[in-house]
């Protein structure tokens, strides 16, 4: 039996910008090779996270440095008989530079109203991405519920206090890679459990975002066991700050934090546990959660 060809993985964004009032414009790119109008996207490079790929391709093809918002989904289609999967996010242009893509790859960038973009887009799957974006809307802020990077196993730790258990060598690499992954969401305020493995993870992010670490003792694993209501009350307070945040905590605690944030929404509560350095990204507008995404751990 012939093995199925694995799909080519790619990522991109529905890139938008504010214009007058509440109006927005969408970026479309023209590809001379195909003579089509599409959304900025490109193939995944070795060792690259999908959201990193999307941010890089947006920068190369449009010149925009973007702040990423909700995941809009994945589209699949064939290119010259080979399968391709493209993952898209919403992304707001916050700074513009000259595109760096070759002119035979991207010939032109055009900013259009959503209605005009729908009429110009060549492919139906791009229109579906646009529709998903319009359904969610703009003005969201992320809260990244992050599990700390990989730590030394409890069975291998001979310290007296489990809160002192550090990252292992793999976890240190993961924490460094998280800086590139989470950069797509823009500058983030960092809140962390007081456990050493969380503080180490947060410290590497703090260096990248030039942000202080705000220690949240109520969000540690053992504090949650003693007083779960304090942790749940605190995460709801953090939601009302209406600022982009990273909350670094623990596998047993994070599902409860997510459930508290998703109360009174139509969204499904995550059921699977997060692996080290993975996250759920909550997107909120006006202190109300409107979307939740899964963000896999960096390689």
Segments and roles (model prediction):
Residues 9, 25, 83-89, 278-280:
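Short beta-strand micro-motifs in enzyme catalytic cores
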Residues 42, 47, 53, 139-226, ...:
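Active-site-proximal alpha-helix that buttresses catalytic centers in soluble enzyme cores
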Residues 15, 30, 88-92, 111, ...:
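Short, well-ordered beta-strand micro-motif
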Residues 2-39, 143-148:
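N-terminal strand-loop-strand
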């Amino acid at each position: 039996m012939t093995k199925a060809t694995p799909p080519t993985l790619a990522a991109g964004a529905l890139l938008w910008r504010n214009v007058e009032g509440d109006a927005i414009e969408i970026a479309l790119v023209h590809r001379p090779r195909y003579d089509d109008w599409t959304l900025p996207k490109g193939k995944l490079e070795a060792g690259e996270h999908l959201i990193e790929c999307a941010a890089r391709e947006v920068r190369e093809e449009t010149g925009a440095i973007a702040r990423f918002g909700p995941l809009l989904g994945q589209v699949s289609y064939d290119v010259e008989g080979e399968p391709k999967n493209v993952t898209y996010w919403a992304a707001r242009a916050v700074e513009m530079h000259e595109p760096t893509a070759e002119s035979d790859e991207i010939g032109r960038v055009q900013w259009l109203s959503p209605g005009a973009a729908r009429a110009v887009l060549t492919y139906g799957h791009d229109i579906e991405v646009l529709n998903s974006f319009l359904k969610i809307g703009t003005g969201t802020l992320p809260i990244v519920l992050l599990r700390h990077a990989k730590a030394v196993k409890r069975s291998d730790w001979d310290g007296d206090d489990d809160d002192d258990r550090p990252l292992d060598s793999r976890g240190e690499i993961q924490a460094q890679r998280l800086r590139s992954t989470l950069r797509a969401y823009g500058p983030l305020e960092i809140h962390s459990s007081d456990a050493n493995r969380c503080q180490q993870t947060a410290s590497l992010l703090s260096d990248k975002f030039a942000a202080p670490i705000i220690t949240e003792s109520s969000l540690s694993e053992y504090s949650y066991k003693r007083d779960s209501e304090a942790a749940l009350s605190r995460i709801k307070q953090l939601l009302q700050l209406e600022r982009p945040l990273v909350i670094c905590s623990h596998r047993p605690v994070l599902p409860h934090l997510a459930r508290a944030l998703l109360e009174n929404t139509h969204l499904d509560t995550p059921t699977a546990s997060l692996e080290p350095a993975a996250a759920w990204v909550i997107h909120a507008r006006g202190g109300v959660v409107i979307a939740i995404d899964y963000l896999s751990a960096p390689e």
